[in-house]
Amino acid sequence: MGPRRRSRKPEAPRRRSPSPTPTPGPSRRGPSLGASSHQHSRRRQGWLKEIRKLQKSTHLLIRKLPFSRLAREICVKFTRGVDFNWQAQALLALQEAAEAFLVHLFEDAYLLTLHAGRVTLFPKDVQLARRIRGLEEGLG
């Protein structure tokens, strides 16, 4: 058996001398406030990076084959079943125009979102943007 511990008599609590520079110890409550905000900003930077990357790019965002099928389907619908042959350059020009229209529409709708004091884009913002644009701007 090891040495026995002596029982101590109750004493007055000892006073600790104040240390000149407190050293931060490990926290038992979880990560500190700074660490959680760092993780939050790192998570937020992911979608911000994606937005900035897409804003800098000039490539088409809608895939060519699904857009081509949609354009042909709409053409067949409005020509009463007559199927036209499409040149690749014609489909590409149509896709460029469609994407430019959508980008401009969403830019206007997001400005309306900010004007309303929100961050989330709602369908009513897109509807109001189309209504403000009128027939000349492609309301249709």
From Swiss-Prot:
Chain positions with N,N,N-trimethylglycine modification: 2
One Pfam assignment: Histone
Subcellular location: Nucleus; Chromosome, Centromere
Entry GO terms, CC: CENP-A containing nucleosome; chromosome, centromeric region; condensed chromosome, centromeric region; cytosol; nucleoplasm; nucleosome; nucleus; pericentric heterochromatin
Region (Important for flexibility of DNA ends that protrude from nucleosomes): 39-54
SMART domains: H3
Biased composition (Low complexity): 26-37
GO molecular function, one term: chromatin binding
Region (CATD): 75-116
GO biological process: CENP-A containing chromatin assembly; establishment of mitotic spindle orientation; kinetochore assembly; mitotic cytokinesis; protein localization to CENP-A containing chromatin; protein localization to chromosome, centromeric region
The organism's place on the tree of life at top rank: Eukaryota
Listed result of changing residue 68 to E/Q: Impairs interaction with HJURP, association with chromatin and localization at centromeres
Predominant cellular place of this UniProt entry's protein: nucleus
UniProt-reported outcome of changing residue 17 to A: Impaired mitotic chromosome congression and chromosome segregation
Description of post-translational modifications: Ubiquitinated. Interaction with herpes virus HSV-1 ICP0 protein, leads to its degradation by the proteasome pathway.
Annotated region described as Disordered, given as residue ranges: 1-46
Phosphoserine PTM positions: 7, 17, 19, 27, 68
InterPro entries associated with the record: Histone-fold, Histone_H2A/H2B/H3, Histone_H3/CENP-A
Chain's role: Histone H3-like nucleosomal protein that is specifically found in centromeric nucleosomes. Replaces conventional H3 in the nucleosome core of centromeric chromatin that serves as an assembly site for the inner kinetochore. The presence of CENPA subtly modifies the nucleosome structure and the way DNA is wrapped around the nucleosome and gives rise to protruding DNA ends that are less well-ordered and rigid compared to nucleosomes containing histone H3. May serve as an epigenetic mark that propagates centromere identity through replication and cell division.
Quaternary structure (record): Component of centromeric nucleosomes, where DNA is wrapped around a histone octamer core. The octamer contains two molecules each of H2A, H2B, CENPA and H4 assembled in one CENPA-H4 heterotetramer and two H2A-H2B heterodimers. CENPA modulates the DNA-binding characteristics of nucleosomes so that protruding DNA ends have higher flexibility than in nucleosomes containing conventional histone H3. Inhibits binding of histone H1 to nucleosomes, since histone H1 binds preferentially to rigid DNA linkers that protrude from nucleosomes.
Classification via PANTHER family: CENTROMERE PROTEIN A, HISTONE H3.2
Note: Antibodies against CENPA are present in sera from patients with autoimmune diseases that developed autoantibodies against centrosomal proteins.
Comment block on domains: The CATD (CENPA targeting domain) region is responsible for the more compact structure of nucleosomes containing CENPA. It is necessary and sufficient to mediate the localization into centromeres.
Protein name per its UniProtKB record: Histone H3-like centromeric protein A
Organism: Homo sapiens (Human)
Gene this chain is encoded by: CENPA
